[in-house]
Amino acid sequence: MATIKDVAKLAGVSTTTVSHVINKTRFVAEDTSKAVWDAIQQLNYSPSAVARSLKVNTTKSIGMIITTSEAPYFAEIVLAVEEHCYQQGYSLFLCNTQNEPEKIQNHLDMLIKKRVDGVLVMCSEYTRDSLELFNGTNIPMVVMDWGKADDHSDRILDNSFEGGYLATQHLIENGHKDIGVIAGHLSKTLSKERYEGFLKAMHEANLPVRQEWIYEGDFEPESGFEQMNNLLRLEKLPTAIFCFSDTIALGAISALSEKGLSVPSDMSIIGYDNIHSSRFYSPPLTTIHQSKSRLGVKALNILLERIKIDKTQYQPQTIEFHPELVLRRSVRNLNK
């Protein structure tokens, strides 16, 4: 395997010059630079990424910690981040916590050892101790969506409260007064805010919130299926259900279908996230849209900005996105 000394010998220059050409850390004459690159190509020399990172104090790599990359919502964000990393010349280390808090420390330790230039966090499992340890490394961090507030990190917020309010308000405007909820974990910030938005819209319309119509699970379709079946055992049913994710809505619609009930004739359903497949549900799902690609790209751009500037002069920022209602065919208008 060729070494930097072999390249220097073939190009007729010093190893220091080869290093400057590779890392672009000093001006090198065009003819000399060409000789070095010709030698690199001829010898099939591959510089050590670790050695280069020590020279230029960058690894051109980003870490991303998320709850799970399998869920459609997260998958769409990861895809956008990965593509933008590629366009900017960065590699991406993807770490899934799978809702297991103990994994967060192992992932953070690994990313520190990999000397990543920055980290995107999109999970709610990390602890204050973990953050303090990570902040001690001075590695820039951007917290996306689900994350807790932190004085050292930028935050990208999806405004789940506003989204929960919009979803419920749409049901009310379509004449629904008996409205239920199938939520994700209400201990999670995202679910809690959507539920608070639901409550605000209900209270403004002077509509009662019936606790027997409030169901809590996770964000998977199996949870939507199970909780809808639990709801259907009740004597009195709501006319509409606000599902806290499109995947929950998928399970809920499936449960209704198995009971011979149709959406929206027998029960209206509104989802949240506007994942790619939601337009192909039967019926196409009315939902709350938040641009996953825009969220991912914005978070990465902020992180890259932090990486490039003096950390002592940077003030963490909070950026909010505003959700939008996407009208399809899963909500019945009872006013007609």
UniProtKB/Swiss-Prot annotation:
Any idea which positions bind hypoxanthine?
A: 73, 188, 219, 273
Q: In which pathway does it act?
A: Purine metabolism; purine nucleotide biosynthesis [regulation]
Q: Which InterPro entries match?
A: HTH_LacI, Lambda_DNA-bd_dom_sf, Peripla_BP/Lac1_sug-bd_dom, Peripla_BP_I, Tscrpt_reg_HTH_PurR
Q: Tell me the keywords, alphabetical order.
A: DNA-binding, Purine biosynthesis, Repressor, Transcription, Transcription regulation
Listed under GO biological process in this entry are:
negative regulation of DNA-templated transcription; purine nucleotide biosynthetic process
Family annotation (Pfam families): LacI, Peripla_BP_1
PANTHER family per the record? Answer: HTH-TYPE TRANSCRIPTIONAL REPRESSOR PURR-RELATED, LACI-RELATED TRANSCRIPTIONAL REPRESSOR
The GO terms this record gives for MF are:
DNA-binding transcription factor activity; transcription cis-regulatory region binding
Assembly and binders? Homodimer.
Give the protein name, as stated in the record.
HTH-type transcriptional repressor PurR
Could you read off the lineage of the organism from its UniProt record?
A: Bacteria, Pseudomonadati, Pseudomonadota, Gammaproteobacteria, Pasteurellales
- Species name: Actinobacillus pleuropneumoniae serotype 3 (strain JL03)
Record keyword Transcription present: yes
Q: What does this protein do?
A: Is the main repressor of the genes involved in the de novo synthesis of purine nucleotides, regulating purB, purC, purEK, purF, purHD, purL, purMN and guaBA expression. PurR is allosterically activated to bind its cognate DNA by binding the purine corepressors, hypoxanthine or guanine, thereby effecting transcription repression.
- Free-text domain note: Consists of two structural and functional domains: an N-terminal DNA-binding domain, approximately the first 60 residues, and a larger C-terminal domain, approximately 280 residues, which imparts the function of corepressor binding and oligomerization.
| Gene3D superfamilies listed in its UniProt record | 3.40.50.2300, lambda repressor-like DNA-binding domains
Query: Matching SUPFAM superfamilies, A to Z?
Result: lambda repressor-like DNA-binding domains, Periplasmic binding protein-like I
* Residues annotated as domain HTH lacI-type: 2-56
